[in-house]
Structure formats: structure tokens, C-alpha cells
A protein has these predicted regions:
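Walker A/P-loop phosphate-binding motif and the immediately C-terminal alpha-helix
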Residues: 2-43, 47, 117
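Well-ordered beta-strand positions
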Residues: 123, 147, 200-203
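Inter-motif core of Ras-like GTPase G domains
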Residues: 119, 135-155
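Conserved beta-strand segments of the P-loop GTPase G domain that flank and frequently precede/overlap
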Residues: 38, 92-93, 125-127, 149-153, ...
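Cytosolic-facing regulatory segments adjacent to core modules
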Residues: 72-83, 89-132
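Phosphate-binding loop that captures ATP/GTP phosphates
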Residues: 31-88
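NTP-binding/hydrolysis catalytic cores, primarily Walker-type P-loop NTPases
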Residues: 217-277
């Protein structure tokens, strides 16, 4: 399957999809590629706990999706840079907002936003809300993304969520666009049985205590150092290969014929031949 640059992630509550979106973006940034993470959940805004408490988010995703006119420059200016990582930017709802904070998002505006966003960065990760049937943007994100990663859990609640939403996804999963994974897998759980309920899974992300601590301390952008995080990191890299065709490159290793290019910093991204807007 041909690789694209836009991935949508959807999953049950507690599956770790937002954590996964962050760690995927961080791994992409190591390759000096620009990535935008769109935290599209209007019910539980996640940008506030992905950034330091003293860092303000000026423009909300809700404002962009309901703007009378939308341009690439407006999207770019609304992006929030991740501290100490110039290759990653965030978009999402602000603290205290919800779906009722803005006028109804139209299909036309959501499509326009996604089309513009696709051309603004090397890679785009769309972290969809678990209640996607109530959010037109999340539904369209899954329709327009090149690949969709469905993340479930190996407990009964996760399986129940999948069964309740499977019908809404039927007819959309064609040509290998949808891939499934089990997240937050804990020792003692039966992932094989759960995988059967999901129709098979391509990835299993284990529970990591260090990840939970980072989540609680709003430090998910920090690297993982514990030994138990190794299998999780391995799965992250496997997803990047499957979805984006991004293979791990050893330090000092370049592709044949590849020439080094000078990076030109243009906040909030480091652009590499992306053109002017």
C-alpha cells in the first residue's frame, strides 16, 4: 500500500491513543521531519495537559473550524510549538471548551481544514475523540486520512466499545486503510482472545508505568528511559514503518545519493522545501 502523510487514531477510552499520538510524533521529530498533532477531542481537550502549565494556547481548533474564512497562514499561526522540539506543533481545543463553545462545525469547513493541513507539514497525526459519532471533524478525519489506527483494550469495556462502534466503521475499512492495535495491555490480560474480537491486531502496546507517570505529570514529550519501555518503543517504530514507511536510520547513515540540506528555521516549524504560503 502506498504511504501517505496523514494518520488518524481512534480508540476506546483508556486505550492510550493520545499517548500513542505523542510518542509517534516524537519519534518522527527525531528524523528531523515536521509533524502536526491535532487533538480533536472537544469533550476532553488534551492540549492543556500536553503542554507546561505556564504555556498559553491562543487559538482553539474550534475557532479555526468555525472561522468564516480559513487560510494556511491562519492554521500555521494557531499551531502551538512543543517546548524543546521545533519539529512538533499542536492544534486542539482550549481548557474549559467543549463542543457547545462554538457554532456547529460544517463538513465543508472540516474538509477545507484537513486539505490545508495536509500540505503544511511532512506528517499529520489526527487524535480523534472516542465519541466520534458526535463529532463531524473526527468522522471526516477518518475518511480523509491515508491510514486509520484503531486502538482498543484487552478488557471487556474495550471490546464492548468496539462492538458498539464496529457498525459505524463498516464500509470504510477498505484497501487496508484500517489497522488495529491493542493498547495499555497489562500482564495477565488475554490479548489473543481480545485480538480475535477485534478481527486481528497488528500491534500490541504494553502498559508502561513510566508512561503513566509522564501522563500524570504532563511530561509525555520526555523520552522513555526504563527497561520495560523497550517493547512499547519497538511497536511505535513498527507503526511508523507500516503507516509512513519511516524506517529507523542508524546514526551517520544516509540513503544512497542523499545530500545534506541546510535547515531554515521558520517558527513554529523547521521547513524543508515546503514552499511559501
Amino acid at each position: 500500500m502506498e504511504h501517505g502523510n496523514m494518520l488518524a487514531i481512534v480508540g476506546s477510552p483508556g486505550s492510550g491513543k493520545t499517548t500513542l499520538a505523542v510518542k509517534l510524533a516524537a519519534e518522527i521529530a527525531k528524523k528531523k521531519k515536521n509533524v502536526v498533532v491535532v487533538c480533536s477531542d472537544p469533550f476532553v481537550p488534551s492540549v492543556p495537559f500536553l503542554l507546561p502549565m505556564d504555556m498559553e494556547q491562543e487559538v482553539s481548533l474550534g475557532a479555526l473550524l468555525t472561522s468564516p474564512a480559513l487560510t494556511q497562514n491562519e492554521i500555521l499561526e494557531a499551531c502551538v510549538s512543543v517546548p524543546a522540539n521545533e519539529y512538533i506543533s499542536l492544534l486542539g481545543y482550549r481548557m474549559g471548551e467543549n463542543l457547545m463553545s462554538y457554532p456547529k462545525v460544517t463538513r465543508e469547513r472540516a474538509v477545507e481544514f484537513l486539505v490545508c493541513l495536509r500540505h503544511l507539514a511532512d506528517y499529520v497525526i489526527l487524535d480523534c475523540t472516542s465519541v466520534f459519532e458526535a463529532d463531524v471533524f473526527s468522522i471526516l478525519a477518518m475518511e480523509m486520512a491515508d491510514r486509520v489506527l484503531r486502538v482498543g483494550t484487552s478488557n471487556l469495556r474495550g471490546i464492548s466499545y468496539f462492538k458498539s462502534h464496529a457498525g459505524m466503521l463498516e464500509g470504510r475499512a477498505d484497501n487496508g486503510k484500517y489497522i488495529s492495535a491493542i493498547g495499555n495491555f497489562k500482564t495477565g490480560q488475554e490479548w489473543e482472545a481480545a485480538a480475535g474480537q477485534y478481527g486481528g491486531v497488528g500491534f500490541v502496546f504494553p502498559y508502561v508505568a513510566e508512561l503513566e507517570k509522564q501522563y500524570d505529570e504532563a511530561s509525555l514529550w520526555n523520552g522513555l528511559t526504563s527497561k520495560e519501555a523497550g517493547p512499547f518503543q519497538t511497536e511505535v517504530k513498527k507503526v511508523l514503518v507500516e503507516v509512513f514507511g519511516l524506517y529507523e536510520t542508524k546514526q551517520g547513515e544516509n540513503k544512497p545519493g542523499a545530500e545534506k540540506k541546510k535547515l531554515v528555521v521558520r517558527s513554529p516549524f523547521v521547513w524543508k522545501n515546503k514552499g511559501e504560503f
